[in-house]
Amino acid sequence: TILQDFTKVVKLINESRFLFDSFQFRFRNYATISGNFDHWHIDYVKLDEFLNSTDTIQLDDVSFVYPSPSFLKRYFEMPWTHFVNNEIMELKDSIDINLRNNGASTNVDYQYNVFENSNQIFHYPLIGLSRNVSVLDYDSIGNFSFTNPPISIETNVFNSFQLDSATFIVQNIIGTASSDYKYNDTIYHTQKFHTYFAYDDGVAESAYGINIDGAKLAYEFKLNRPDTLRAVQMYFPQMLDSVNHIPFDLTIWAKTNGLPGTILYSESFSPVHTEYLDYHTYYLSQPFRIVGDFYVGWQQTTDDLLNIGLDKNNTANSYMYYDAGFGWTNSSYNGSWMIRPIFSMN
């Protein structure tokens, strides 16, 4: 089954062989090893006495339930040289933060701060220390959403004197009652502006592949100024069988009538399986200049599943295309491929 929400489970530990000082326990899952399947998460673990199997008491807690979102409208990350002077076009007007309240309805204070090199350069809200909101309990409304009004983003939120790249830390904080569980009241994300474009957040919850010889996969990107494509980063998660001996044609297409058109570049490579979610960088033998919109992807030379990493927390389907022999079509699998083109003028 596919479960999208947490469910509560009560396990009684009442056998004498467990009732001793320094008792320990662990959780183990049974999973399919042929792919990124059977993922599950443990949220709260409460060990207490005098509970029974029908106990419904939960931890009194208000917490963040999703990662801190990117402030960019189209990409998760992008080059600094393409962001500067295009802030209005590239930044979201607002973001949404979801909270879950396991206890009774309560008021919480929310704020976010932006740091560069440990120096705070921006604070939300613009007036006052924090924004106070009433968060109803989860059983009444589900997750609380900051939609009325949303959390605003100003065009000067990322202000830096750096010329080529910049890195910012975004800190989200909720202020709750002193009795509230405190280890999940702050979340961070790093907003990077380096040399690559990325729709993904760097974590593969799944994988995507086409097992058809000659099939093509193309990912759309847009440049705000002419630039030189020097490399492409890809993340191929290790599945049941290694495919690092199977070649594919890394391909760059021009945009023609809204779809991949003329091939601008093609070079043969093979998947490289890395550890710890590290991307492998494919350096082009002949870097070349690109203007405007283009596509990055590959053409298959076999019917093997190459399986590019798929980030399911960020959806970029409108920029993801495949051609299995019947023309270009948008991918119907929600997520974003873990493919990142790298640019620099030098």
Task: Name each region found by the language model.
Residues 242-318:
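Aromatic- and Gly/Pro-enriched, solvent-exposed loop/edge beta-strand patches characteristic
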Residues 20, 223-233, 245, 291:
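Extended extracellular/luminal ectodomain segments enriched in beta-structured repeat modules
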Residues 38-44, 299-345:
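Short, surface-exposed beta-strand/loop patches at domain edges
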